[in-house]
Every structure is written in structure tokens, then in C-alpha cells.
């Protein structure tokens, strides 16, 4: 393995690492908030919202992430809104991941005893207050493992930015590979950078899961 490729192009790798990390953090936060909102829509008693939430999840989960990315990168300019590769990839990643997070959280909410909601309502809580303060905290504890898997998938799926010049690790690796005419070594180093992101995240999720188990 030619280590000099890493050192000679270290600034490009670090730039890609930064944009991958930034896109992952933004998409993680955005997809979690959106996923919670859609999950609540799916279990609400107001049928139009329930149908809208179900349609969103089923539609987004069953089309490729690449297609969603192309819609934002190539399609929006036709409507007068232009996003650069980083923005288009991050928005697509957020929307795509939110559908899977919504399903995980919906399952978590429905696993909480219905008596919890009834008790909260009888104590004077509104539906929104009961959901926010009573149901969701319990549901989040239950769905930490599947959420952790989705967050790990999100980091790995961030490589989609490379397809639309999103400045991420894969995009920078393509540039390095083109300039050095070396392929294998370049992408092995990229894999190591991804591990720097995913291993701490995996450890953190496992730690949080154990802490939450002790709190029961």
C-alpha cells in the first residue's frame, strides 16, 4: 500500500472528511426531527394526517436514494431553485433517512402501553403534551438499537454526495484517483476515514443503550 498517496493528498481527504461529517450531522438532526413528526402523523386519530404520513413513508422508502438526490440536484433548477451538490445530497439524505426513522419510532410509540396515554389525559395533559412528555421518551428508549442502525446507515449513505460533486470523501477520492491513477489504495484510505466516523458512533449507541437499560 502506497502511504504517500494519503500524505500527499491529505488536505483533500480532510476536506472530504469534513463535508462528510457535516452532511451526516445535518442529515442526522433533520431526519430525526422529521421522522418523529411523521411517526406522530402516522398514529394520530386525524385520518388525513395519518394518510399523509403513511404515503410519505411508503413512497420515500420504496424509491432509491440516488433518484431522490437527482430530483433535488437536477430537477429543482427547472422550478427556479438551484442547490449545489452538497445541499442537494444532504437534503435527499435527510428525507430518505427520515422515512426509516419514522417507521422505527412509530413502532416504538405503539409498543408503549395505551394506558400511559389514557393516564396522562386523565391527569390533564393534552394529546400533544402527553405524546411529548410521556410517550415519546419511553418510545425513544425502546428504539435506540434500530435508530443507531439508521444513523450508521446514514453516515455510509452520505457517499451519495460524491455522485453530484458534493465535496465528500468519495468525491475527493475520485479526484485523487484520477490525478494519481491509483484506485485501490485511494479507496482503502477512504474506508479508514469512514471507520473513524462509524466506529465511535456505534460505540456511543451501544453505551447509550446500556445506560437506558439500567434506567428501567
From Swiss-Prot:
Spans through the membrane: 21-41, 63-83, 85-105, 132-152, 181-201
GO cellular component: ATP-binding cassette (ABC) transporter complex; plasma membrane
Limits of the ABC transmembrane type-1 domain: 17-205
Location(s) in or outside the cell: Cell membrane
Bilayer topology term: Multi-pass membrane protein
CDD domains assigned to the protein according to its UniProt record, in alphabetical order: TM_PBP2
Function: Part of the ABC transporter complex GlnHMPQ involved in glutamine transport. Probably responsible for the translocation of the substrate across the membrane.
Similarity-based family: Belongs to the binding-protein-dependent transport system permease family.
Protein name: Probable glutamine ABC transporter permease protein GlnM
Organism: Bacillus subtilis (strain 168)
Name of the coding gene: glnM
Amino acid at each position: 500500500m502506497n502511504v504517500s498517496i494519503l500524505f500527499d493528498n491529505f488536505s483533500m481527504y480532510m476536506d472530504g472528511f469534513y463535508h462528510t461529517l457535516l452532511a451526516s450531522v445535518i442529515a442526522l438532526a433533520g431526519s430525526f426531527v422529521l421522522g418523529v413528526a411523521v411517526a406522530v402523523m402516522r398514529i394520530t386519530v386525524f385520518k388525513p394526517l395519518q394518510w399523509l404520513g403513511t404515503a410519505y413513508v411508503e413512497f420515500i422508502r420504496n424509491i432509491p436514494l440516488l433518484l431522490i438526490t437527482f430530483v433535488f440536484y437536477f430537477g429543482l433548477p427547472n422550478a427556479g431553485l438551484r442547490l449545489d451538490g452538497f445541499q442537494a445530497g444532504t437534503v435527499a439524505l435527510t428525507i430518505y433517512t427520515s422515512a426509516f426513522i419514522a417507521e422505527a419510532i412509530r413502532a416504538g410509540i405503539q409498543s408503549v402501553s395505551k394506558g400511559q396515554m389514557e393516564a396522562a389525559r386523565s391527569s390533564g395533559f393534552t394529546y400533544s403534551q402527553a405524546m411529548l412528555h410521556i410517550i415519546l421518551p419511553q418510545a425513544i428508549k425502546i428504539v435506540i438499537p434500530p435508530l443507531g442502525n439508521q444513523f450508521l446507515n446514514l453516515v455510509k449513505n452520505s457517499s451519495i454526495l460524491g455522485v453530484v460533486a458534493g465535496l465528500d470523501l468519495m468525491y475527493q477520492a475520485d479526484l485523487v484517483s484520477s490525478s494519481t491513477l491509483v484506485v485501490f489504495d485511494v479507496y482503502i484510505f477512504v474506508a479508514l476515514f469512514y471507520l473513524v466516523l462509524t466506529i465511535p458512533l456505534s460505540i456511543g449507541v451501544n453505551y447509550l443503550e446500556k445506560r437506558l437499560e439500567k434506567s428501567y
